[in-house]
Amino acid sequence: HIAAYAELNVLSNFSFLEGGSHPEELIERAAFLGYRAIALTDRNTLAGVVRFHTAAKAKGIQAIIGARIDIEDGASFICLPKDRSAYSRLSKLLTLGKRRAQKSMCKLWRSDIVEYLQGQILIILPPLSFSASKLYIDQKRIDSEFADELSKWVEQLSGSVYLSASLCYREDDDSRLAALQKLAEQSGAPMVATNDILYHHPRRRPLQDLLTCIRKQCTITQAGFELELNAERYLKSPLEIKNGYEKYPDAITKTIEIADRCEFSMTDIRYKYPSVLTRSGNSAEDELRVRTWEGAKKRYSIDKYPLGVPESVKKQINYELDIIEKLKYAPYFLTVYDMVKFARERNILCQGRGSAANSAVCYCLGITAVDPNQSAVLFERFISEARGEPPDIDVDFEHERREEVIQHIYETYGRERAGLAATVVTFRSRSAIRAVSYTHLTLPTSFLV
């Protein structure tokens, strides 16, 4: 049975040293609990969304893509793009914040957000201090400032701003939910239930405490209120969440409303290849054919091959070109050809490798060095209509002169259309053991793997 609830506030371990579960674990648990939709909203990053999407697709669950945005002059909020254009704007916003800050940090102000609001759904996160009269002396000021901030968001993005309500499992939960509901009615931002997830299962709590100690650079005995007060920030069943909001059923139904509005999927993202590499009047397909046959004549020159290009190679080239044209990959091959041509003209060592070595076209373009006339090539390992995956040509450039190639790419296609692959920082056994030892915390070795 699938209950009518979608979890919209979830951190994974891509919120480094904060989230205690892998995206795949969250999806696995969500499928077990009967979720039809769940969001991934890591803090100031979209780094985990591909793994999240892949796992969700395998389980038949809607993966809602988003991020938790922290700003310097206001409350944090969940940002959920409704379509591909909104996802692009969210990516640009996070890039802006990352460029301003030190490594792994993000620095944004409210004024930055306005330019990127179109197509977004915002779920504003009230501070834990909201309506907590027994804990804070200046409670009225805290509540008033947050109410004013929420009203401003509603004015700027009417119809797409919601107010998050999470059970803190404190004695003042009832009064806090009542205060949030009242504020929602006053501001016009509907209240929506979230559970502020940090890990997929209750037994992951000790690991999350450990991560907190490492992040705060303290021992477990020093951590105190830095640790979560309880083990409730795990992925609960939709029915359990629903029971916690019996007085506020609309807060549950709003989660499905938001899920339905978030139509963006990672499958919406497609390669858009450059179109500036063709001669006047030529299509990309015609240009690729010309370049390939020019290269074939050089590879199979008369002095080595008196009869010209071998018939078997001609047949293979035509076969590959037909598939490339059918799948509209010609601009991609021309792009790689341009980079390799640039490098070779400047005597920069380069070599294509991997599955591209199974392509006669790549050989004729000078990208790879495997002669299809001397070895059996299996083009389907490189490009397959059945797989429906775009080709992947790996080219190595000599380290000392790689920057020249990068600058050529920037100048030819524009810096805004080029990207460098990033690596994800992870713990390995030795570094994990060292970090744990600093916290003076003993854990089973299974937590360190």
Where are these regions (language model features)?
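Single conserved hydrophobic/aromatic residue that forms the stacking wall/gate
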Residues: 440-449
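Phosphodiester-processing cores and adjacent nucleic acid-binding clamps
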Residues: 1-441
